[in-house]
Regions:
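Nucleotide and nucleotide-moiety/phosphate-recognizing core
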Residues: 1-105, 114-129, 136-141, 148, ...
Length: 189
């Protein structure tokens, strides 16, 4: 991490409960599980599961996706983490499975979890790591697709995707967004 810079808060988006544990919409949680150097612990005051890694705070909001901003903002306020040091890790159906895209800011697109965070911080200047989950096959609705478990082909490469996502987060924490964007915003695994 940058000496003297504020710490990072990394928020992995997902939904609580066994029903959602291995679904595409929970890839943010799965990426944080791959990253964490200690077990997550439930923190009711932050509406989430919290851990530490490389000096950063990690949170898996347990508010359900559409209210993720409540949990992320609570932890950021408590530890005085500015919005530009909050990294949101989320699924993206517009990216091919396994593709990573790191951005320092932008709109939420159609992602309600990211939208909740942007609303709670009142800015679009919140960094994010989007992890591609691919588009739903026709005629499947996007809502059904993101809440479905990974397919057999995806499960076969999921560990590599999660390991690469965790490595991208580590590069962000250590060297910053620009370095990570140069290294990971490329096609494929």
């Amino acid at each position: 991490m940058d000496a003297g810079a504020p710490t990072w808060l990394v928020a992995g988006l997902g939904n609580p409960g066994a029903r959602y544990a291995r679904t595409r919409h929970n890839i943010g949680w799965l990426a944080l599980d791959a990253l964490a150097s200690e077990p997550f612990r439930e923190e009711k005051r932050f509406d989430g599961e919290v851990a530490r890694c490389d000096g950063a705070w990690l949170i898996k909001p347990t508010t359900f996706m559409n209210l993720s901003g409540v949990a992320v903002r609570a932890l950021a306020d408590f530890y005085k983490v500015p919005h530009d040091r909050v990294l949101v890790v989320l699924d993206d159906a517009a990216l091919p499975f396994g593709r990573l895209r790191i951005r320092p800011s932008g709109s939420a697109g159609s992602h309600n979890g990211l939208e909740s965070i942007l609303v709670h911080f009142a800015t679009q200047e919140v960094p994010r790591l989007r992890i591609g989950i691919g588009a739903p096959p026709p005629p499947m609705a996007l809502h059904d697709y993101v809440l479905a478990p990974f397919g057999p082909d995806e499960e076969g490469t999921l560990k590599a995707v999660l390991d690469r996502s965790a490595e991208a987060i580590r590069v962000i924490l250590k060297n910053g967004l620009a370095a990570a964007m140069n290294e990971f915003n490329k096609e494929g695994l």
